[in-house]
Amino acid sequence: MIKKLVSILIFMILNCISFASISATELSWDIGLTEQRNLITARGIMYEKNAPTILYLAGLEGSSQNSAVLNALLENYSQSSPTDSAVNLIVIANANPDSESLQFPPTGAAFSENSVSHVLWRWIGTHAPDLIVLEAGQDFGFSTALEEIGIAGFGNIPIESLSASNTTMQFLRFSSDLARSQARAELDRRTARTPRAVAEQLAAIYGYDFSSPVYVPGMSIIGRLRLGYIDSVNDLLSPYLIGESFEISNASVMAGQLVFAEHARITGNETSQGLVLSAANLAFDENDQPFEAMPMHYEMSDSFFMATPLLAKAGVLSGDDRYFDMAIRHTAYMRKLLLRDNGLYRHSPDADVAWSRGNGFPAYGLALSLSEFPKAHPARDVMLGYLVDHLEALLPYQDIDGMWHEVIDYPGSFAEITSTAMIGMAIKQGLDNGWLAETAYRPALNKAWNAIKIRTSFDGIFINACTSTGKMPSLEAYLDRLAIFGRDDRAGGMVMNFAIDMAGL
């Protein structure tokens, strides 16, 4: 009898400890913008990563009386004891605040057309609940689309109609055994991948065409070189290595020469080295004097990546410090032109907008350059200060899922994958080299990598890769840039290299 009582007591203590260890995290998301630039938000109470997730969705037709009911449910749930909290809860109480006409699955260019439809479709997909409780009424094909094709490439999610019985604490308490949705299973499958697996999956798709020697396909070719596919890449580069000429007529071709820098580093090929030095020599006039900045910068922050790493790699390949000197000269020039008071970079002087890749380029470009810089170079610490200052300015703008956004400091602009990969690579190199504090940046890196995996399918489909973007005249123009949902060479190269960095290769 005593043994039985002791066993019961131990069981009760262990359960108390287990319940005490459960704590709620209250979250809020700026999930997107309406066509009128009004914010669409979600709120959540999250307990355990692996607990079932229920999403309540109201207001597809516009303002809804059920919004108050759902907000009250959320508040009650946030104040409940841990023993009552069996599921993660997300509420989108006012999904369509401007009463736009919706269409599911969405058509048109995201997010300038059918804005709200695209926002909801992609955001709900990347958060993959196990059950959606949907307000009754016109759903614009949402339920049918989920059943017939699944959501945003993740798969199906069961739907229940909102009712008095499923907006209670009792309903939430008894949902702890809710089955995994197909969408959640796909999300888990994506996040379970190792960095090497992601890199290899992308290397099977991207990096097979260098007929135009520009950086967009070039980044995937660099990734494939890093993964060891040297013979295959040799075949791609052979026309240039045996004398086929090309003109470096723009910054994209200039940055494409990074392929030859990586090829020279790995293979020692002298022709590749010569192509790198030939491109880097564009920094100097006919008297071998440095220009104020590298040509073809077009006053855009892209140039931190398009030119600076090439100069640093030329310095390593040649052993000539003038390339390092020019790298810092160019960086200082661009920084003076484009740095904003908040530590972010405007994309160009034409619009004071902190565009996503317009900040990814400086972060990644300087990290790449610093990885090549001699520690004894007198300007190295200056460039390192530029990078650290920029990353410190970027860090507060990482969202709770791990992403940076199309306009870094504009709430509700879309979560953009290429810039997140580039900033992630800068942070990874900063941590590996001891430039950044582990406590601040390691969690940010892990969040970014997890978010990237969620938005990268097994067959190389990406969610929200900003299309090619030159100088834009206004904030509106940047907010309306196409967010690609599909295969994309630019995202393929950046995400592949991020995966390789995360794999430590």
Model-assigned labels for residue ranges:
Residues 41-50:
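Short beta-strand-to-loop junctions in surface cap/lid or active-site-entrance loops
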Residues 7-17:
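Bacterial N-terminal signal peptides
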Residues 1-5:
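Positively charged n-region of N-terminal signal peptides that target proteins for export
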Residues 186-218, 225-226, 230-282, 286, ...:
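CBM-like carbohydrate-recognition segments
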